Amino acid sequence: MMDEEILDFQSVFRLPDESNDDLGTLVSGSTSQLARTVLLQTVLVRATSTAAMLGAAGAHQVCLQAWWVTLFGLDSVAVSAQALVAASLGKNDVPGARIAADRALSWGVGAGVLVGVVVFLSADQLPYIFTNDAEIAAQAATPIRILALLQPLNSAVFVGDGVFQGSADFDFLAKAMAISAGGGILALTAAGQMEGASLTSVWLGMATLMFGRAATLGWRYFKDDESPLYVTPFECAVYYDDLPSVDVDFVDVDAKVSKDETTKPR
């Protein structure tokens, strides 16, 4: 029989103190993240239903699998960005957080370019990893090339998500996803009603979603002075000036050579 002192059921089901400010922050952030996830999944469901109406459900699933594989690979940079930004902001070091985010974005976009090139060059063979049906593989080839071209943009978006999650900017992420998802759903709806539409049209609709996410996150990152990572160029310059410097004694090589020549024994 378990000791009641070890497991206190009353404490498990006790309501939290309403005066706790951290609880409100937790609930608000969690709600925003839930809304963001629901909006994104709504777009993905809409894309799948549109592909099914066009008779390309199998090829669409192949493309989605390629999407998820690249996403999880590139998302590793986003996880690093999230941790670095959170650590810097925890020390009230906004310029340091911004510099870490800039570096993560650079690495993310570079990795996206590399992955995009590999996916684009293997677009005809890649579907056969997921299917042995030649017709489905042929249907998936062109959308996979679109996916390949999107990789640098996708990576920037994933890192941007990580950066703003690290800065606890959850409310903005939900609003940005609402705008982007709205554009994506409109594009997918138009694709489903377009005469002669194909799976390529569906993935152009997915591209609309990603362009919307990139635009909203980019505005927040580069333009919005209310962003938690907003810094002026002067603040960045001061940050670099405050970095520990290394004193280096520079030697005039030409003067030293001349002196050595004049003092050399004849």
Predicted features and spans:
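Short alpha-helical transmembrane segments in multi-pass integral membrane proteins
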Residues: 1-34, 85-150, 190-266
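Alpha-helical transmembrane segments of multipass membrane proteins
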Residues: 45-49, 69, 117, 125, ...
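Short runs within selected transmembrane alpha-helices of multi-pass transporters and secretion channels
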Residues: 1, 74-78, 147-166, 172-184, ...
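Alpha-helical transmembrane segments of multi-pass membrane proteins
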Residues: 24, 63-70, 134-160, 182, ...
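Helix-terminus/linker motif at the lipid-water interface of multi-pass membrane proteins
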Residues: 14, 34, 38-69, 87-88, ...
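Residue-level hotspots within pore-lining transmembrane alpha-helices
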Residues: 31, 35-39, 43, 51, ...
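Small-residue-rich hydrophobic transmembrane alpha-helices
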Residues: 57-123, 155-168, 172-173
